[in-house]
Structures are given as C-alpha cells and as structure tokens.
Amino acid sequence: MTKAEKVNFVIDTLENIYPEVPIPLDHKDPYTLLIAVLLSAQCTDVRVNQITPLLFAKADNPYDMIKLTQEEIKEIIRPCGLSPMKSKGIYELSHILIDKHQGEVPANFVDLEELPAVGHKTASVVMSQAFNIPAFPVDTHIHRLMYRWGLSNGTTVQQTEKDAKRLFPEEKWNKLHLQIIWYGREYCQARGWKLDNDIITKTIGRKAAINEYLKNQKK
C-alpha cells in the first residue's frame, strides 16, 4: 500500500467508525473551551469535565474570573493537578483578554499563544474546536498512532503535527484530529492494546510496531 493509499484508508476507516465525533471537553463558548484545555494539561478529560462545572458556576467569563483570587481558583481546580501554575495562567490570561481583547478570546494563533499558559497545542485546539479554523492539535494519542501507522517518524509532537498537516487534506484536519484521538483511546491504547481490535494498525501498521506487539504477547 502506498502512503497515499494508507492515508485514504485511515480517513475512510475513521469516517466509518466516527461519522459524528464529539469534542471531549465540555464547554459553551471559546472562553470556557480555552480554560478547559488549559486545565487538561497532564489531566484526563473526564476529570476536567468534573471540575469545570464547579469553576464555571462561579466564573464562566473573564470579567467574573478576575473577581476571584488566584487562591480561590487554585482550590477549585486542585484535582486537575498543577493548580498553582494553572490558576495563575487562568487569572492572568483573563486580565489580558479584558485589557487587550474586549473580553473576547482572539481567533488567531499569534494572540492566543501570547496568553499566559497557552502553548501551540492549546491554541490549536481553540482555533479548531471553537472557531472552526483548520488546525491539527497533536496530543499523545495522535503522536503514538501516527508512529504506529508509519505515517510519521517524528520524535516530537511538533514534527508529528507537520507530518499530519502534510499528509491529510486541510479541510479534514478539524474532524480528523478528534477521530484519531477517539480511535487511540478506544482501539489503539498505549497500554492494554489489542491488535485484533485495531483494524488500522493491523492493516497498515509499521512492521516494527506490530513485531514489538507480537513479541510482547509471547512473554
């Protein structure tokens, strides 16, 4: 199978499995999505979705958020981990949104990535899921799957993102990155992975990844 055929197989298979694909983080607008994505660093989406209703009940916009102290924010988000850094980021970026952006989340990478605690991946998620602007946020699931499928040799998420953008049509990026995340969680996990359930890796997977799996099964 050529690389182009592999890419088409991935697109078609994921479209069959996930014709409708949910956004993992609960939110109602760009601001609440931005905060949820910030909280998701080194934390599960399930945990974030348990904590954000508690935070957003007190403040679901930057104007209300800056009425809270950093300490109050930190106590609410503590179960998400890294709460000192995240609470500082939430408080400071809320101030900047008010001071520089009329309280609105900017719909461009430059302004987003200038916000405290907002890196390229967070900005990409907001651009894609809040504003429907083509982006391809790469998380650990996408990084792992692109390697297993032989579509990227990237040792960093930055390189994997470049490969994904080069291989997949731009008009499919926003949906496809979500489809790959869900597929990684349900069929191609880092641990407890069962090749028989993983039609994509079984069909187009990197030989080294498949051989490693088979070797581990014999132990």
Residue ranges and their predicted role:
Residues 2-218:
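Catalytic cores of DNA base-excision repair glycosylases
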